Regions:
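One-carbon transfer enzymes
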Residues: 1-252, 320-322, 327, 332, ...
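An anion-binding loop in the catalytic cleft
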Residues: 2-4, 235-344
Length: 344
């Protein structure tokens, strides 16, 4: 599409983790046709990762570098790649030079202050993976899993002064089947959000500009996800622990301890059968039988059976810390004393 440069929608994209990539890709795809101008991509700064401590960009930072090469190869001006610890004077000056019309953000991880937002004549919009005002905050995907919701969704909101309180431009529902992990649901929300975003951005190409509607209903906020959020309390019910395992995959991973060694649990399910007849009764330090966290035995279809404070959980994929992730059968080959022991 041939347009005068001054009439094209000029976008600055802000995002960092993998969930932002489909939205970035969709915007870049359209910008390559000349319909929009992707002025820049702002991401979190590079960080040291892994045991070697090598400095690496975030997922959006890696893709931004490749996109810049692709734009150049097409004879187009490459989007500027911006990485700042804060959005203060230096960042504002860099963005101001790009003269963007609209800020588009998805999981950037920082608050946009009024001085920063004043750089965008059309303001800003944000992709948020929940049905706002439900689950405002940084971990709405994990929250929906932890709460065992039957539906969640994606919202496109105006960026407002207070976090996740902006007027709603569009929403889409995502049905849940109760087996999603944070990883799998992030993938679904990423695709759904990108599709929704492009439809909303098209509305900014014409007058009147979309205004959105105020958020309706009671607001709720996400639990702050921390490393310790993965620690399993076997006194809780099997459905609660199952949801915790799924919500903590891929981070921080659900964890328990066996004979002083940390175990990461990747997959589990609710067990509706009877306790195994060939299992060994687990004992705690006081000698009482079958405590919570007791490893009761196995079910050939479901995995390793563990007693919880409400029901039995079947573990199917797990690992000792820093060792190979294994299906339950292979795991037990290297843990002969596991059945009849207790997880804490």
């Amino acid at each position: 599409m041939n347009k005068d440069e001054t009439s094209k929608l000029k976008l600055l994209f802000a995002g960092s983790p993998a969930i932002a990539l489909p939205s970035l890709e969709k915007i870049a795809e359209i910008a390559k046709t000349g319909r929009w101008i992707l002025t820049g991509i702002i991401t979190n700064p590079d960080k040291r990762k892994g045991r070697g401590g090598s400095v690496e960009p975030c997922e959006a930072g890696s893709r931004a570098a490749l996109l810049a090469e692709e734009f150049t190869a097409l004879g187009l001006k490459a989007p500027a790649i911006l990485k700042f610890d804060t959005l203060k004077a230096e960042a504002r000056a860099a963005v101001s030079e790009l003269k963007p019309d609209l800020l588009v953000s998805f999981a950037y991880g920082r608050i946009f202050g009024p001085k920063f937002m004043s750089l965008f004549p059309l303001g800003g919009i944000n992709v948020h993976p929940s049905l706002l005002p439900k689950y405002r905050g940084a971990s709405p995907i994990q929250e929906a899993i932890l709460r065992r919701d039957s539906v969640t969704g994606v919202s496109i909101q105006r960026i407002a002064a207070e976090m996740d309180t902006g007027d709603i431009l569009s929403q889409a529902v995502i049905p849940l089947n109760g087996r999603e992990t944070a990883a799998s649901l992030s993938d679904i929300a990423a695709i759904k959000g990108a599709q929704l975003l492009i439809d909303v951005l098209a509305q900014f190409e014409k007058q009147p500009l979309p205004q959105g509607i105020p958020q309706q209903g009671e607001a709720s906020y996400c639990t702050v996800l921390e490393k310790k959020s993965g620690l399993i309390d076997w006194n809780r019910s099997a459905p609660e622990i199952d949801a915790q395992i799924r919500a903590c995959n891929p981070w921080p991973l659900a964890q328990t301890s066996h004979n002083g060694q940390t175990i990461n649990i990747f997959e589990a399910s609710l067990f509706s059968g009877n306790a195994p007849e060939n299992g060994s009764p687990a004992v705690d330090a006081n000698g009482s039988g079958n405590p919570y966290g007791g490893v009761l035995g196995i079910d050939k279809k479901s995995g390793i059976l563990v007693q919880t404070g409400g029901g039995i959980l079947a573990i199917s994929l797990l690992q000792y810390q820093n060792r190979k992730i294994l299906p339950w059968q292979a795991f037990l080959n290297g843990a002969r004393d596991f059945i009849g022991s207790r997880l804490v």
